Amino acid sequence: MTRDQTATFGRHALRVAGSGLLVAGVVALGLLGWQWRANVTVDRVAVTGAQHAPPDTLRRLARVGRGTAMRAVAPMLVADRVARHPWVKEATAETQWMQGALTISVTERTPAALAVDAQGRPAYYLDRSGHAMPLPDSAGYDVPLVRGLEAEAPWTQPDTAQTPSSLRRVLRALPEAGVADLVAEIEMQPDDAIQLTTTPIGPHDALPVHLGSGNVSRKLRTLRAFARQVLASSPDEPIERIDLRFDGQVVTRTRPLDG
């Protein structure tokens, strides 16, 4: 073997040896990384975004305690468990391996109405979609009252206690029609029809409003326009009832002025 062949062979051998060492190093690091991941456990469960849902309650729903193997945590399953709390609208979960933490982020429902029982006592809140939330320990919300619903919390019997669709339509339409501050009460009738009670407007006290069925958003916009154009003024005869059951029409009942 010539001197050049010997040098070439030596360089080739060095490259092979170097490649082998590199592969061995990568494999060793991989094994160390796998071993590290296998030993990482959850040190803390952090909850963010919760205002009314107690964080400890959400942690119990998550069913991931300190010492749980991080590789055994399924974030989507954890989020699904947490989202079962009545106040939680959306939930996400994220594992943070380096910190040994599980972070749960929640978005809570926004109250749109307050259901009261037959004695007028607060029972539970409702959001715009008709989901019920238990009364929080913190301060209440300035939202319309809902009468005529079951006083028992719907989340205790989800298969039998459901918010009527007519009420859900009204709750969704109130802010869209710009009348959320105009409606003081929503009363469910036996046939699931809706009667509203306004806040005092101009010289008028609170007025009952028969809403009827049909296009709820359009009816509420009609009520808003009527309140601005008529109720805010002083009519010849005070209005004591408003009927919106007929599309495109506002029917009122008046009472004669005394004297």
Curated annotation (Swiss-Prot):
InterPro entries xrefs: Cell_div_FtsQ/DivIB_C, FtsQ, FtsQ_C_sf, POTRA, POTRA_FtsQ_type
Topological category with respect to the lipid bilayer: Single-pass type II membrane protein
Domain POTRA, residue spans: 40-109
Main location per the UniProt record: membrane
Transmembrane domains' residue ranges: 16-36
Keyword Transmembrane part of the UniProt annotation: yes
Keyword list, A-Z: Cell cycle, Cell division, Cell inner membrane, Cell membrane, Membrane, Transmembrane, Transmembrane helix
Compartment(s): Cell inner membrane
Gene3D superfamilies tied to this protein: Cell division protein FtsQ/DivIB, membrane protein fhac
A biological-process GO annotation: FtsZ-dependent cytokinesis
Keyword Transmembrane in record: yes
Spans within the Periplasmic topological domain: 37-259
Cytoplasmic side: 1-15
Family: Belongs to the FtsQ/DivIB family. FtsQ subfamily.
Function: Essential cell division protein.
Protein name: Cell division protein FtsQ
